[in-house]
């Protein structure tokens, strides 16, 4: 049975949505959750029926969102530190946290270690697309200052991930740039372009719009660019839906039309862009599975993050990454 260490104290809303998400996940899938945090508080929120279905590891400290990620290594009694240690010590297969993302990534990288041939891990996320499948973008925040070699490794990891997780054969990998021509880009992307040509699925430079139009399956960028893209996209989605609501309220025919489209159109659209459907972002390149969830995650997001951790662990994606990069040496 897959064992998942879950930081029960991380997140903006405390342990309640996390425990609720664990309960929802247990109702649908078989796995062993290990809740790390204040045992008394966890037990007070856990329904009686599920008490014997979880393990609890006591942690007396919580790393707040305002704390420095660099201090995470010193906070050995924190819930996220102890959760990561369970994976390091092979007592769990995966770790999940909606807490301090910087601390989670730091601890996962330094305590769990990196896969062979990986110099830096990358945070990966799936973006909605007009194509048959969603588009994987990496890095979206783990490494702000990248080398060309980092970007090459990101491309290889992304290729392996979508093959194993999304079952896409011969995935197309693009390098995010300011134009699709081979000559476009800055010093970093131009050097990375040469390295990425060694990947069988590399199709060249892509523009921001190509993330969403189905042109490629994987988009590679540095964490600084990727994080800006991710947050800008979230803002666009929020704005578009709010504008739609405003215009619908101003017109009776629009209200009637919206009512007719509510279930089959709007509900499906919302599902495509709802971050809670994705649950969290895997930190690719670490020796194990680490899922970083949004601080504002609700129970649905936590449930889906757990499902993502289960799928990641079962897929053997890390072995695929190692194999792919060892072939290129």
From Swiss-Prot:
GO biological process: fatty acid biosynthetic process; phospholipid biosynthetic process
Name listed for the protein in its UniProt record: Phosphate acyltransferase
Associated pathway: Lipid metabolism; phospholipid metabolism
Catalytic reactions on record: a fatty acyl-[ACP] + phosphate = an acyl phosphate + holo-[ACP]
Subcellular location: Cytoplasm
EC number: 2.3.1.274
Main EC class the enzyme belongs to: transferase
Subunit note: Homodimer. Probably interacts with PlsY.
Described function: Catalyzes the reversible formation of acyl-phosphate (acyl-PO(4)) from acyl-[acyl-carrier-protein] (acyl-ACP). This enzyme utilizes acyl-ACP as fatty acyl donor, but not acyl-CoA.
GO cellular component: cytoplasm
Keywords: Cytoplasm, Lipid biosynthesis, Lipid metabolism, Phospholipid biosynthesis, Phospholipid metabolism, Transferase
InterPro entries according to UniProt: FA_synthesis, Phospholipid_synth_PlsX-like
GO MF annotation: an example: phosphate:acyl-[acyl carrier protein] acyltransferase activity
Family that this chain belongs to: Belongs to the PlsX family.
């Amino acid at each position: 049975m897959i064992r998942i260490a879950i930081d029960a104290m991380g997140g903006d809303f405390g342990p309640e949505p996390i425990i609720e998400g664990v309960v929802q996940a247990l109702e649908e899938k078989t796995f062993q959750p290990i809740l790390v945090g204040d045992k008394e508080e966890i037990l007070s929120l856990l329904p009686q029926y599920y008490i014997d279905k979880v393990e609890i590891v006591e942690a007396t400290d919580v790393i707040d969102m305002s704390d420095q990620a660099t201090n995470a290594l010193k906070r050995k009694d924190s819930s996220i530190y102890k959760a990561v240690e369970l994976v390091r010590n092979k007592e769990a297969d995966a770790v999940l946290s909606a807490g301090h993302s910087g601390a989670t990534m730091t601890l996962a990288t330094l305590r769990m270690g990196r896969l062979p041939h990986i110099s830096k891990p990358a945070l990966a996320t799936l973006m909605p697309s007009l194509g048959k499948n969603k588009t994987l973008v990496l890095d979206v925040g783990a490494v702000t200052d990248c080398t060309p070699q980092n970007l090459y490794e990101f491309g290889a990891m992304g290729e392996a991930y979508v093959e194993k997780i999304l079952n896409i054969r011969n995935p197309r990998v693009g390098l995010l740039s300011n134009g699709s021509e081979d000559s476009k880009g800055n010093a970093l992307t131009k050097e990375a372009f040469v390295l990425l040509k060694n990947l069988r699925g590399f199709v060249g430079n892509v523009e921001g719009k190509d993330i969403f139009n189905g042109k490629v399956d994987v988009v590679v960028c540095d964490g600084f660019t990727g994080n800006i893209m991710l947050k800008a996209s979230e803002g666009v989605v929020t704005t578009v839906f709010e504008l739609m609501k405003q215009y619908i309220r101003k017109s009776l025919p629009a209200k009637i039309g919206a009512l007719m489209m509510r279930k089959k159109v709007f509900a499906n659209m919302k599902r495509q862009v709802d971050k809670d459907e994705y649950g969290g972002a895997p930190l690719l390149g670490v020796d194990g599975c680490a899922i970083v969830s949004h601080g504002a995650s609700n129970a649905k997001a936590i449930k889906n993050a757990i499902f993502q951790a289960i799928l990641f662990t079962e897929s053997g994606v890390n072995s695929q990454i190692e194999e792919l990069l060892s072939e290129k040496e």
